[in-house]
Regions:
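Positively charged n-region of N-terminal signal peptides that target proteins for export
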Residues: 1-4
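Bacterial N-terminal signal peptides
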Residues: 6-18
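Solvent-exposed, well-ordered amphipathic alpha-helical segments
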Residues: 13-16, 57, 128-132
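Short, helix-capping/interhelical loops that line the mouth of catalytic, cofactor-
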Residues: 23-48, 92-153, 182-193
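Short, contiguous alpha-helical
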Residues: 50-54, 58-64, 71-110, 149-193
């Protein structure tokens, strides 16, 4: 079961051919599933989630930064959300899912509106990733089977892990599509420097 869960998380947080656990090794860096060469990883689900978060944060925030302020009202069709709405959704879902995973209250934030400035919406998205980093820092796998409220139903806390990682993939893909439809190359499609 844990192997399937870890594989699902890795698949949902990997964009293209770039691995989610990339980066130079550091003695101060947290131990990751990829850095283990012998024996089982302690808390593999949360270890993989925490290792994936910085790259997801980097790519999603870079996509938001890449969209010009005057295009935050853009939506591909009348039935789709605006780019600003997507950014609001990213901030709100990060806060909600990380609070659920960590079993702590969501941060209190001012209501965000689609008419808010790019700077305000970008700051809210950035703050939501910072909140996730802090909220998830000490969570271990032992509580992931506990039931938590998901709307009108109870689900294991690990459902929030799936929702969060799946959301990151979906949100980046949507932002990349909005960028491309405006003639802007998404961050992960940029040539390496």
């Amino acid at each position: 079961m844990k192997a399937i869960l870890i594989a699902s998380i890795l698949a949902s947080v990997s964009f293209g051919s770039r691995p989610c656990l990339a980066g130079p090794p550091s003695s101060a860096a947290p131990q990751t599933a990829a850095s283990q060469s012998s024996g089982p990883v302690k808390n593999p689900v949360m270890t993989v989630l925490r290792a994936a978060l910085p790259l997801r944060q980097k790519n999603i925030l870079a996509a938001i930064e890449a969209m010009p302020a005057d295009k935050f009202g853009y939506k591909p069709t009348t039935d789709q959300m605006t780019f600003a709405h997507l950014v609001i959704h990213i901030a709100e879902s990060n806060n909600a899912m990380c609070a659920k995973i960590a079993d702590i209250p969501e941060p209190k934030i001012d209501e965000l509106k689609e008419t808010d400035s790019k700077d305000k919406l970008l700051a809210a998205a950035r703050a939501s990733f910072d909140y996730c980093t802090t909220a998830l820092a000490n969570v271990d796998d032992s509580k992931l089977g506990d039931n938590v409220d998901f709307g009108n139903t109870q689900r294991p806390r690990v459902a929030a892990v799936f929702a969060l990682t799946g959301g990151w993939a979906d949100h980046y893909a949507a932002a990349a599509m909005y960028l491309r439809l405006n003639g802007i190359l998404p961050p992960t499609a940029q040539p390496k420097k």
